[in-house]
């Protein structure tokens, strides 16, 4: 068997990926220290001067692993030294370590007993791309949505205090996640409770404060050291015996003098945190002593401000952090990602381009995104209309109410948010938008199952949680051409809120319209006429319905296919017609219980369509469980929402066994 080794650039020298047959394997001989580490306990046995080499090898292993699997890349490279230092200084998993979001957790997984599976990241049956409680004791709290770490950590710290424990609780949160209100709610609560909690702010965009080199490192060691803290505590005790005005002023002088010297931290001090930093997050000579001092502090809460660089140690990622935030498989030597040429435009790009065309005719159209401009297609709109584009940061609650405010003044806001993230702004959808019937347009991306990001990012519930709201128009695009028309439809809806949902990924490659044409509200369409079976689809499962209908035809079952287009208002006439004229009616959607199928069933019951027992009705929905990551195709097959599953459901409704009917799908 031939072994051909790929030449690796200097940035990852001493490390090789080899091809043995069709299998990519790693030459672990180039990571001698990392090879000795199965858990952080092994890391803590090493001499402090060896920690630098471990970090270097950990970075190489991370680069090689992600080049094979794809995944979130830049953030993980940015915290290699920090991850190594935390596990070296703290007694994990006894000391609880909570990573916010989890994008940066790959090096953490390698150090915590999962190196042998690191090349299964985000694949079916493999490691999650985020932290996950069921995966490891070193993941005490699961994450994938941002800004939850401080709240969870505070809960753990309080539980420790109530139980009489003495372990540390550490939350690592990025500066981007600090744009969400939840982080400040937690910090405000933590400061008031004075519970011993360590928050490490990973500032990888330098958006809060720039590093200040050796002076900052010296001051951070000084202020986190025992001598300074003892003097500070003694001064506090003395202050209790002084008049309140004098004591308050003395405390302010101390806080602001530290803020002046360190060029940051006043906000965190005001929230009740003891601030340390900023520290160079790639300099272990700075990190290790500061973290040791912080570990030994008896009072809290404490915030350690660490400045890092996304993509650190891999030049292509350092040069283009945005392009290497998340990657597909790539060539280590060049950084080139192996992206296949798309057969059709992505839904997000169709949305962005369609909105641009509408905005060229209507200067009241504006676009809003919550820190996901490229993921939602809003970047396309921004290129054309930067003054009408608003990226509000990781702040979905604010995004929704901000859009509501724009709507009150006659503007036409399109709030483009992933389905999973719209959950974070649900009260605002109800209270600030729906109750007031404000015409906010929701563009709900990543509807349905999303693949490698798994359950945390699945758009499973928006049909259910929006469908119960009065006066809401809810659409789902069956293909990319339908999405163009639905964007135009939303522009025309000025008396109530509306939503259109569409999935991640490419469209079907259908012929695209030059311009969008508003659809009749609450009206579906017949795609194929049959007589025996009716398939009523809501969303992009329409393509699977067509495959299923072909198979059913081979078994003599003439099948009607209908595209509902609207869940609310539902096309009542269409639903009743399908129930009246067919033996079996099956609804298909990419959503949970309580969604489209529930609305159809309620309509049929209210209109007496089920009273005679002449039609057999079934709803095909996502299973009542959180599906683990896999490819979207595999996930939908597991859910039974593919052509094979639809055919099986038809035979089940007819009282026949699909296996005995020898159904074979192409």
From Swiss-Prot:
Reaction it catalyzes: D-glyceraldehyde 3-phosphate + pyruvate + H(+) = 1-deoxy-D-xylulose 5-phosphate + CO2
Keyword set, alphabetical order: Isoprene biosynthesis, Magnesium, Metal-binding, Thiamine biosynthesis, Thiamine pyrophosphate, Transferase
First-tier enzyme category under EC: transferase
Organism annotation: Nitrobacter winogradskyi (strain ATCC 25391 / DSM 10237 / CIP 104748 / NCIMB 11846 / Nb-255)
An annotated Gene Ontology molecular function: 1-deoxy-D-xylulose-5-phosphate synthase activity
UniProt pathway annotation: Metabolic intermediate biosynthesis; 1-deoxy-D-xylulose 5-phosphate biosynthesis; 1-deoxy-D-xylulose 5-phosphate from D-glyceraldehyde 3-phosphate and pyruvate: step 1/1
Cofactor: Mg(2+); thiamine diphosphate
Function: Catalyzes the acyloin condensation reaction between C atoms 2 and 3 of pyruvate and glyceraldehyde 3-phosphate to yield 1-deoxy-D-xylulose-5-phosphate (DXP).
Entry protein name: 1-deoxy-D-xylulose-5-phosphate synthase
UniProt xrefs under Pfam families: DXP_synthase_N, Transket_pyr, Transketolase_C
Cofactor note: Binds 1 Mg(2+) ion per subunit.
Oligomeric form and interacting partners: Homodimer.
Sites where the protein binds thiamine diphosphate: 103, 144-146, 176-177, 204, 314, 396
CDD domains from the UniProt entry: TPP_DXS (cd02007), TPP_PYR_DXS_TK_like (cd07033)
Domain of life: Bacteria
One GO term of the biological process aspect: terpenoid biosynthetic process
Positions annotated to bind Mg(2+): 175, 204
Record-stated family: Belongs to the transketolase family. DXPS subfamily.
Entry EC number(s): 2.2.1.7
